[in-house]
Design a protein with these regions (language model features):
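N-terminal active-site segment of His-dependent metallophosphoesterases
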Residues: 1-65, 70
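Divalent metal-coordination and catalytic microenvironments
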Residues: 13, 31, 43, 48, ...
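Metal-dependent catalytic neighborhoods of phosphoester/phosphodiester hydrolases
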Residues: 19-23, 47-67, 85-104, 193, ...
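His/acidic metal-ligating clusters that form di-metal
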Residues: 38-42, 133-136, 148-238
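Extended active-site neighborhood of metal-dependent phosphoesterases/phosphodiesterases
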Residues: 61-174, 267-272
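Binuclear metal-dependent phosphoesterase catalytic core
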Residues: 121-128, 216-223, 235-288
Length: 288
């Protein structure tokens, strides 16, 4: 393929359960298909990798997933959703499992952990030059005040986005324009789909964002380097809208052991230096 092309596979909402049943096996089949057919350079798991509520040994399930992913020639990156740490394990426990058992985990840069939620960057390199920065932010799980259902990105992480962008500007003396951001829970701004009316893809359920808007989108606009954002969480959405020059996308639900009417799949993102990224939804033909 193209030497300067970097491909990213977004796997979201795999929802692997503790019983290794037929549904989970299909999820593993989907992962295998996507890895072997598309051979992504980087694979980003955008949350709800596992079920954990009432699961005694969710750590074993997560370890199995990490070990399974070791067989592929890709770099693994993760963030967490609202279902990964509802049991005994904290996010720090899941990160420890990644550290211990994942042999192809991506190099994290500029890591900042706030309330056990991590933000970090991935540096995409072409010909010894960093051409893109991928920002990964853990948006948490449930609202700490019981306001609505879901958590919001912490102000410290919004500030981190500003400072980290500044650090890259200073380090490279270069204006990045094609960077991306990954998180689990959609921002409130995704709701603009209802006002814009113009979108690509499927919009089949209300946007399950936080009731609190902590201003991440305003910082994305101010930085001016982020061209696209990707989340998961809403299994019946996979649309993209262009909001004030930033494309906001859902992935495609990948897990069989969970709700949702969409054909299971993933999202493929293609990066090239000095070009707008390309992205498409991939479906897994699971009829056989």
């Amino acid at each position: 393929g193209d030497e300067t092309m970097t491909t990213i596979l977004q796997l979201s909402d795999l929802h692997i359960g503790p019983h290794n049943d037929e549904k989970d096996q299909k999820t593993y089949d989907l992962i295998h298909h996507m890895m072997t057919h598309y051979q992504p350079d980087i694979t980003v798991l955008t949350g709800d990798q596992i079920w954990s509520e009432g699961v005694i040994d969710s750590g074993r399930v997560y370890k199995k997933l990490m070990e399974y992913l070791n067989r592929y020639d890709t770099q693994i990156a993760t963030t967490f959703g609202n279902h990964d740490t509802e049991g005994h394990l904290k996010r720090s426990d899941l990160r420890a499992i990644e550290d211990q058992y994942s042999t192809n985990y991506v190099q994290k840069n500029h890591s900042l952990i706030v309330d056990d939620k991590e933000a970090y960057t991935i540096e995409v390199v072409n010909n010894d030059t960093v051409t893109h920065v991928l920002y990964v932010i853990d948006g948490g799980d449930y609202n700490p005040f019981g306001i609505g259902d879901y958590d919001f990105i912490r102000p410290e992480h919004v500030n981190w986005l500003r400072e980290t962008h500044q650090a890259y500007q200073t380090r490279f003396q270069h204006n990045f324009q094609h960077n991306l951001l990954f998180t689990h829970i959609p921002l409130q701004e995704y709701r603009e789909v209802e006002n814009i009316g113009e979108y690509h893809g499927i919009f089949n359920e209300p946007i399950a964002c936080s009731k609190i808007n902590s201003g991440l989108f305003s910082q994305m606009l101010l930085n001016g380097d982020i061209e696209g954002m990707f989340c998961g969480h809403d299994h019946d959405n996979d649309f993209t809208i262009n909001l004030y020059g930033i494309r906001l996308s859902f992935g495609r639900v990948g897990g069989y052991n969970t709700y949702g009417d969409l054909q299971r799949g993933a999202r493929l993102i293609e990066l090239q230096p000095d070009a707008i990224y390309k992205s498409k939804v991939l479906e897994f033909d699971d009829r056989f």
